[in-house]
């Protein structure tokens, strides 16, 4: 086993025995095999398109789902990977039979999970390239594609698809075995950022088209007496279906982690039993889930090894999987609802205060004139985008301290689960504009980009010339894809922490520093001084 795709990788170098995330050696090898077979499918699909042979939507969806399922904290169940690998291989072979071009050696996949795992040992990420810098760039591309695939899959579930984006994903996968130089691979990394921008745009259209544009909404952090279901992950459609199926049952629905922004969507917040938010970010789930007196539903990624005390109360859906945890399909949450009815629920109302969400692009741009006026009058001196992934590794209290120490004439924009380091801080407002604006989930980086571009247009300058600084935290591969999007857009001076990716070599890092002035975080005091002067 060798895996270094997440920020918490062992010793800052790579996991070699078992993943810090909980991934076993066997699952790691199966995922490596799946990536290899997807790379082969990408090669064949790209050749097919060049020859005018149609690639079906089924193959496109299979590709996005397959790539997404290898992202950190999505699927830990080796048996669930067996049909995925076989379906990808079958799709590859069916297309290959129609293609005249030589697509290289195609891996004949084995039968059982154990056999597939053994087979996967031949395809570690270290085999991407003998040259460590070229391998680093190929890893950046593949990890970026995992983020692209996640957003592409989410968007497709909501009916938003783009055949050109699927074609680009296939072509990017086909790059892995090719002998390319630094310049070409850097170009592909930037292309991945462009692809991710499109994927986030599709997902934004899917979310807002189905559920309306988020509006500023107060969300209780306490509880309401009664039966309860907790929804974690990122999937709005799963939440909507659960809300419909629990209407009139007396069960209250709570969000966890990155589901918090769902409270701002008009078509979700209209349900009276959609009550509040429970807990914080993904890495605290063992403690928080153990104390939740109802059923728990994990959508998309961010699952950790369930503790025995709640293993019987937690369910997965979509691409999420953990061995021994009940998986529900087709949007039928009857089992989850039955479990919630069986469990005690909250005994009494509790008041733990409230937080504000719903400051996506439509809301912020709706008060753009007030924001611009505030900047011109000197009331708002600077904007900070402080967001990204949260995690368990020490050093992430930097983000709490940074936000608390930011001057009163600055505005904090935030998104993704990194916000939980400070989401409940009372920072006040500037001329009626809250100083802490929650833009949404990680994919709502699209909203943040639209806000930045609109402000740049209003001030007739480039985004890099705005009084805006990005202080980002990363953990998994969606953060890689978002970073590549920002670099594709030419955004510079990004501060990144709590540590730099293990898969970035010194030479590749030097390129990023020289061209984009990416820098690691230092201390809140030093960074604020450097930014504000």
Swiss-Prot record:
Subcellular location: Cytoplasm
Coiled coil: none
Residues with the Cysteine persulfide modification: 389
Cross-referenced CDD domains: HCP
Pfam families: Prismane
InterPro entries per record: HCP/CODH (IPR004137), Hydroxylam_reduct (IPR010048), Prismane-like_a/b-sand (IPR016099), Prismane-like_sf (IPR011254), Prismane_a-bundle (IPR016100)
Organism: Maridesulfovibrio salexigens (strain ATCC 14822 / DSM 2638 / NCIMB 8403 / VKM B-1763) (Desulfovibrio salexigens)
Organism superkingdom: Bacteria
Cofactor: how bound: Binds 1 [4Fe-4S] cluster. Binds 1 hybrid [4Fe-2O-2S] cluster.
Keywords in alphabetical order: 4Fe-4S, Cytoplasm, Iron, Iron-sulfur, Metal-binding, Oxidoreductase
Name used for this protein in its record: Hydroxylamine reductase
Main location as per UniProt: cytoplasm
């Amino acid at each position: 086993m060798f895996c270094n795709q997440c920020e918490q990788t062992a010793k800052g170098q790579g996991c070699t025995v078992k993943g810090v995330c909980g991934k076993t050696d066997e699952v790691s090898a199966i995922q490596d095999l799946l990536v290899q077979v997807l790379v082969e499918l990408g090669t064949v699909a790209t050749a097919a398109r060049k020859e005018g042979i149609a690639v079906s939507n089924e193959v496109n969806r299979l590709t996005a789902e397959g790539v997404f399922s290898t992202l950190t904290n999505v699927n830990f169940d080796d048996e669930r990977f067996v049909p995925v690998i076989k379906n990808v291989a079958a799709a590859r072979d069916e297309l290959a039979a129609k293609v005249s071009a030589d697509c290289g050696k195609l891996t004949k996949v084995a039968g059982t999970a154990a056999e597939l795992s053994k087979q996967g040992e031949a395809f570690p990420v270290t085999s991407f390239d003998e040259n460590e810098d070229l391998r680093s760039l190929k890893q950046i591309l593949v990890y970026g594609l995992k983020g692209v695939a996640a957003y592409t899959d989410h968007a497709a579930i909501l009916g938003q698809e783009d055949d050109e984006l699927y074609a680009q994903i296939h072509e990017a996968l086909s790059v892995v075995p090719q002998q390319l130089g630094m310049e070409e691979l850097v170009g592909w990394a930037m292309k991945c950022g462009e692809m991710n921008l499109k994927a986030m745009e599709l997902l934004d259209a899917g979310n807002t088209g189905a559920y309306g544009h988020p509006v500023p909404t107060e969300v209780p952090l306490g509880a309401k007496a009664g039966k309860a279901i907790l929804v974690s992950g990122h999937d709005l459609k799963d939440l909507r279906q659960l809300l419909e199926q629990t209407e009139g049952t007396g069960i209250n629905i709570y969000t966890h982690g990155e589901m918090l922004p769902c409270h701002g969507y008009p078509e979700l917040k209209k349900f009276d039993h959609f009550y509040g938010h429970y807990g914080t970010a993904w890495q605290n789930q063992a403690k928080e889930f153990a104390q939740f007196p109802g059923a728990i539903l994990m959508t998309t990624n961010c699952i950790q090894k369930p503790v025995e005390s709640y293993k019987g109360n937690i369910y997965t859906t979509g691409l999420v999987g953990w061995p021994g945890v009940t998986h529900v399909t087709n949007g039928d949450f009857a089992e989850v609802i039955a479990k919630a009815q069986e469990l005690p629920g909250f005994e009494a109302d509790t008041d733990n205060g409230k937080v504000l969400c719903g400051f996506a692009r439509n809301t912020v741009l709706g008060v753009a004139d007030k924001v611009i006026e505030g900047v011109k009058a000197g009331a708002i001196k600077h904007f900070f985008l402080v967001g990204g992934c949260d995690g368990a590794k020490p050093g992430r209290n930097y983000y709490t301290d940074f936000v608390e120490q930011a001057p009163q004439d600055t505005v904090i924009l935030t998104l993704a689960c990194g916000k939980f380091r400070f989401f409940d801080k009372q920072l006040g407002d500037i001329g009626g504009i809250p100083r802490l604006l929650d833009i949404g989930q990680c994919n709502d980086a699209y909203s943040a980009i639209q806000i930045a571009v609109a402000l740049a247009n209003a001030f007739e300058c480039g985004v890099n010339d705005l009084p805006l600084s990005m202080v980002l935290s990363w953990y998994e591969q969606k953060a890689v894809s978002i970073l590549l999007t920002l670099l594709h857009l030419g955004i510079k001076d990004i501060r990144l922490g709590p540590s730099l990716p293990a898969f970035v070599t010194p030479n590749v890092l030097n390129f990023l520093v020289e061209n984009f002035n990416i820098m690691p975080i230092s201390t809140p005091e030093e960074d604020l001084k450097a930014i504000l002067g």
